[in-house]
Amino acid sequence: MGLPNKRKGGYKMSTVIEHSVLRDAFQFPLGDALFGRRSRRFSFGTSIPDGPLSFQSPRDVLPLTGLEQMMLLTATCGNTGWHYMITRHARYAPHISNYSAAAGGRTFPSAAGVHTSEVFFTNDEGVFFMETRDAPSLLGLGTDGKTDPEALVEAHRKCIRKLSDGRLHIPREEPYMLGHNTWCANVPGSLLVIPVGDVAQHEIALLCFLVQNGYCIYDDVNRLKISGLDRFRGLVDVDHPYPLTWVEQYALTEVTVELSTGCYAGMLMLQAMGLGGWMYDGIDRYTLLGTSGDPKVPGLGFRYDTDDRWALPNPTGLPGVFEGYCPPHYPNMRAAVEALARRKFGPGGPFHPDTPGPWKDTAKVRGSAQVYSEEFKECVATMAQYVYDKFGKFPGTVPSIYTHMFLQAHHLDLEFYDFHFKPGAYLETHKRHMERWHTNRQRSCDR
């Protein structure tokens, strides 16, 4: 198992079979994926000990191959080339809208192209991090102008780094996961994909959006205006502010869309490849991140804070890997605002003229965005710092770092479905998966 090894010249498809299965997966009909999608939880080596669907798998656990994992991971969070950004708003024309924070698009949408999420994943061999949110275009094209699956997989393999050995430890019991998942979640041989979003960064981006359009916020929790905003009357309407909780619900919702639609994209790829699995939220997110307070269950190892004002711990980031745009990863919220400005307008960002792109005159398009002024950044930072000071964290009413939707992939035990279900419980791709993706193993099983 594991991921493809790095070879001289990169990962190469070693057989005609690998070329063929990749092409077949890319050409799988969208309608079949949409309407053939089901949560198929019963994997090789699984057991349901009781009830009307009791069954013991006769098959040995079979981990996903490196190629299978790369296909699924690329579908879940892969780069899809340069995104087109939001192009116009009359308020600041002829400048192009400057909302986006990433220059590249991915297999899932992100509100205004902010893209704050990244993917962690675990298998039998370890815990890994796949970094694609600020990647340049990785969409390799063949001589026919179509996507080259081999080049795409190779490019994304280079985005992965290993964090630790061994499968992520999640006790298969409550309260670490919901009881109905204890028999099938994170089982040996499976791939568990864990998208994580930076809500703190997304909220800063939302505050920038508000200021760009002449708005500001007030503290509706404590029924207070934010002190210091009067000096920005030339930028924002201080007399008609938006409520803080509205903005924070907005930020959390938009981040959740990233996490969920990424999993859904991977779910569709499961159908194309003929793998079992499902997307779900039935693992405790504090257990996964490592903020449960249980030293026996360190999870991903994110640092977190607690406070008597909060009912739950607040994760802020994994140092050196995935750090939220908030203290203690930044000394104050002004520094976090500056970091977002660098991501947008600095080298590689969506509004830097030297960043490549899809337009005939990309430098002109990217360079036409209005760069944040010092006054602009100070206005955003004033609101953000108020929230941090008043609530002890940023955002004030929702988590700084968030995860709540996951994707699992495994080899499907068809015998369970043949025994308990009417015909049609799985697709032709599931029926032929072992024959197509594991030819040598299938011959051995058939003897």
Regions found by a protein language model. Give the residues of each.
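Acidic, surface-exposed loops and disordered segments
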Residues: 1-447
